[in-house]
Swiss-Prot record:
Organism domain of life: Archaea
Protein name, entry field: Uncharacterized protein AF_1514
Organism for this UniProt entry: Archaeoglobus fulgidus (strain ATCC 49558 / DSM 4304 / JCM 9628 / NBRC 100126 / VC-16)
Lineage of source species: Archaea, Methanobacteriati, Methanobacteriota, Archaeoglobi, Archaeoglobales
Amino acid sequence: MEIMDEIKVNLQKEVSLEEAERYAKNIASKYGDGILLSVHDSKTGYRAPEVYCCGEKPWEVYACNRGANLKISVNQFEFYFRIEVEGQAKY
């Protein structure tokens, strides 16, 4: 798996998936145009897309195989983005 930038945000309050996603998208937008590829909630086990494969973290494998280059963690939520700058992948 390729190495990607990782940003961790620990809010001192509980947030919903929707709130955490807004935080993550706001942060990602500062790096360039991005697309959210996958998400995982370590507390409930929720993941999107709901893929099963590889014996590893399938949501991470899915995102990496589609060019993820930025992981943003907000509390227990993990968001994987592919960031592009001026039409090219960041890396």
